[in-house]
């Protein structure tokens, strides 16, 4: 007697890694960019649109990861949520932790997560008038959605930073927390 296939709705959330083929992701992501590009007038609007798409994913991803984690408690400390994003979220999204997590030396409310090889910027070729576009705005939106739903409101942006001796720039996700978050964690 063979087992009947399990309906996707009946599968437990705690199982499965949910890995997808990189070429499938690249195709889907390039179609998202094309979709957004057809509906904008200026380049900065495209980053905003990508960020908004990512923002809607953030709370759902946070819930899923909290259910899948063995000791599924929500983080209440600033460094705890940043470490969670740097390791757990990044591993879930990209299969590896981010390359670095740093506190800004210029502002107490700013933190940076760096990735030397951001997959969302890897397979994208842009026209000249959009050459300054950073497709990692999508990832920044996901991070902002996670932080806001975890009660750490922040403004999250993505930036390209040139690295000496490297052909491609690294991506820095800049997280600027609202003042009440810094006061609460002081």
Swiss-Prot record:
Entry keyword annotation includes Transport: yes
Coiled-coil regions listed: none
Record keyword Iron-sulfur present: no
Location (main, coarse): Golgi
Assigned GO CC terms: endoplasmic reticulum; TRAPPI protein complex; TRAPPII protein complex; TRAPPIII protein complex
Disulfide bonds listed in the record: none
UniProt keywords, alphabetically: Endoplasmic reticulum, ER-Golgi transport, Golgi apparatus, Transport
SUPFAM superfamilies in the record: Ligand-binding domain in the NO signalling and Golgi transport
Subcellular location: Golgi apparatus, cis-Golgi network; Endoplasmic reticulum
InterPro entries associated with the record: NO_sig/Golgi_transp_ligand-bd, TRAPP-I_su5, TRAPP_component
GO biological process, one term: endoplasmic reticulum to Golgi vesicle-mediated transport
Subunit structure: Part of the multisubunit TRAPP (transport protein particle) complex.
Family membership: Belongs to the TRAPP small subunits family. BET3 subfamily.
Cited function: May play a role in vesicular transport from endoplasmic reticulum to Golgi.
Protein name: Trafficking protein particle complex subunit 5
The encoding gene: trappc5
């Amino acid at each position: 007697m063979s087992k009947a296939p399990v309906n996707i709705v009946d599968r437990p959330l705690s199982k499965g890694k949910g890995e997808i083929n990189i070429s499938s992701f690249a195709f889907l992501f390039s179609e998202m960019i094309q979709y957004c590009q057809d509906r904008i007038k200026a380049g900065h609007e495209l980053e905003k649109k990508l960020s908004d798409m990512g923002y809607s994913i953030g709370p759902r991803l946070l819930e899923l990861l909290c259910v899948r984690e063995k000791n599924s408690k929500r983080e209440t400390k600033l460094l705890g949520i940043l470490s969670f994003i740097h390791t757990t979220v990044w591993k879930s999204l990209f299969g590896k932790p981010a390359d670095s997590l740093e506190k800004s030396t210029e502002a107490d409310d700013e933190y940076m997560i760096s990735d030397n090889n951001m997959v969302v910027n890897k397979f994208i070729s842009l026209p000249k008038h959009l050459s300054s576009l950073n497709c990692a705005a999508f990832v920044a939106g996901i991070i902002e959605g996670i932080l806001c739903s975890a009660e750490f409101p922040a403004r999250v942006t993505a930036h390209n930073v040139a690295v000496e001796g490297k052909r491609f720039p690294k991506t820095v996700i800049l997280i600027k927390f609202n003042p009440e978050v810094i006061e609460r964690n002081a």
